[in-house]
UniProtKB/Swiss-Prot annotation:
GO terms of biological process kind: mitochondrial electron transport, NADH to ubiquinone
Subunit record text: Mammalian complex I is composed of 45 different subunits.
Protein name, entry field: NADH dehydrogenase [ubiquinone] 1 beta subcomplex subunit 9
Record-linked InterPro entries: Complex1_LYR_dom (IPR008011), Complex1_LYR_NDUFB9_LYRM3 (IPR045292), NDUFB9 (IPR033034)
UniProt KW Mitochondrion keyword: yes
Organism per entry: Gorilla gorilla gorilla (Western lowland gorilla)
Similarity annotation: Belongs to the complex I LYR family.
Length: 179
């Protein structure tokens, strides 16, 4: 799974939905032919729909526990993992193709005109970055002791309305994959 939050923070509905999605993904690994997969997916959906409106939370929790145990015994030993998903064969392999953000400065105005909202927002970020750069560097110099570690996590903003130092790369991300 890409991200598994602690179970105590999920609502009952979220737990059921995640179990349903995991069960369908494992069913895809068992049923390669699409028509058979669809048939068994409909049967599984019907089983989940049977207890959709269960009012007694104790019974609903017990049903969820039993369903998770059944999933554990019926899960596929080698489930299909999409290549770009965490654990997939191509996960995070495209770092060499990620274009640095500054390359967008060289775009022709006609290219920028195709994405007016993005470039308008980008110009606002650039302006804010130019205005806050000196303050950010000064704050970092004040908070970093001489000879201290230079690789620590960045300190948070200290004043109301200020941005954390060197925030620029947090809010702008390169493309995930090449076109």
């Amino acid at each position: 799974m890409a991200f598994l939050a602690s179970g105590r923070y999920l609502t009952h509905q979220q737990k059921v939905l995640r179990l349903y999605k995991r069960a369908l993904r494992h069913l895809e690994s068992w049923c390669v032919q699409r028509d058979k997969y669809r048939y068994f997916a409909c049967l599984m959906r019907a089983r989940f729909e049977e207890h959709k409106n269960e009012k007694d939370m104790a019974k609903a929790t017990q049903l969820l526990k039993e369903a998770e145990e059944e999933f554990w015994y019926r899960q596929h030993p080698q489930p299909y993992i999409f290549p770009d998903s965490p654990g997939g064969t191509s996960y995070e392999r495209y770092d060499c193709y990620k274009v640095p953000e500054w390359c967008l400065d060289d775009w022709h105005p006609s290219e920028k005109a195709m994405y007016p909202d993005y470039f308008a927002k980008r110009e606002q970020w650039k302006k804010l970055r130019r205005e806050s750069w000196e303050r950010e560097v000064k704050q970092l110099q004040e908070e970093t002791p001489p000879g201290g570690p230079l690789t620590e996590a960045l300190p948070p903003a200290r004043k109301e309305g200020d941005l954390p130092p060197l925030w620029w790369y947090i809010v702008t991300r390169p493309r995930e994959r090449p076109m």
